[in-house]
């Protein structure tokens, strides 16, 4: 009877080891996904800020070009 329990016990231990391994992998994947989502939000925010600054600069350039074209002084 003991010889029959040994393989069963080994299978149970192996099953638990596999489950723990799967849990570690799953947890790591979740952490990576959380990081990537956070990184995405951060990049989008920074790009939006940069876009606003570029738009402001483009408007200033257009204004200055218009004044130069009309021959006005910039002061």
Curated annotation (Swiss-Prot):
One of its GO terms (biological process) is cell motility. The keyword Cytoplasm applies. Belongs to the BRK1 family. This is Probable protein BRICK1-B. One of its GO terms (molecular function) is protein-containing complex binding. InterPro entries: BRICK1 (IPR033378). One of its GO terms (cellular component) is cytoskeleton. The gene is brk1-b. Residues 41-72 form a coiled coil. It is found in: Cytoplasm, Cytoskeleton.
